[in-house]
Amino acid sequence: SGQVETRLAQMPLVMHPSPRTALFLGYGTGYTANAAALDPRVSVKAVDLLPEVIDAAGIFALKQGAPASASPVATVAADARRYVQSTTDRHDVIVADLFHPARNGAGSLYTLEHFAAVRSRLEPGGLFCQWLALHQMDIETLRSIVAAFVQVYPNAVAVLASNSLDTPVVGLISRPDQPAWQVETVRSRMTEVSPRMAKALKGAKL
């Protein structure tokens, strides 16, 4: 149904008061990035290590019934960690995908150094979201990731994208320049989105 993929895209977007640019670290099937691009006011870019994944994403998105984006998603074939370190671009929202910590090289995407590099690529008032698939890690790995995250983002909050017993997904989210989260601000933001995004939010039960 794409409900979780839609949440992975839009929960970070609605927690920012006025996003104009969003960077997705990890492209996969393209569903999540396309869901973010439902709002024509948001320019979306996605980075994925494998160009073959980017090429095949359109096929997977079509079979999954992914929503047609309001504007094209810009894609970059690159290592996410190195891309963040080398780019000079800044973004209002940066979203990191569900990287399996046991896969070769993925561990470097959960380090204090990487989280700090991401923070340096946020626009003033920007937001970073790191999604975590809890079923893919043990408790010690989770504790290590959370400890590194809160060192860089002390005001972080955790949100559930999926409370499935089989595939639970939690997000670590922070706006470093924002001292505290205002629930009223998030609720107000959800009433101001584009009609297509509002429909997707309803479909994702947000």
Segments from the language model and where they lie:
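Soluble small-group transferase modules, centered on the S-adenosyl donor enzyme superfamily
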Residues: S1-L23, L62, A78-T88, Q136, ...
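Glycine/threonine-rich flexible loop motifs
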Residues: P101-Y110
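A short glycine-rich, Lys/Arg-flanked "PGG" loop and its adjoining helix->strand segment in the class I
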Residues: Y110-P124, V150
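Short SAM/SAH-binding signature in class I
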Residues: D89-D97
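Conserved Class I S-adenosyl-L-methionine
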Residues: F115, I139-L160
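Short "lid" loop at the C-terminus of a central beta-strand within the Rossmann-like core
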Residues: H100-P101, A133-M137
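Conserved beta-strand signature within the Rossmann-like core of class I S-adenosyl-L-methionine
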Residues: G125-L132
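Class I S-adenosylmethionine
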Residues: S1-G65, A70-V73, A80, I139-A147
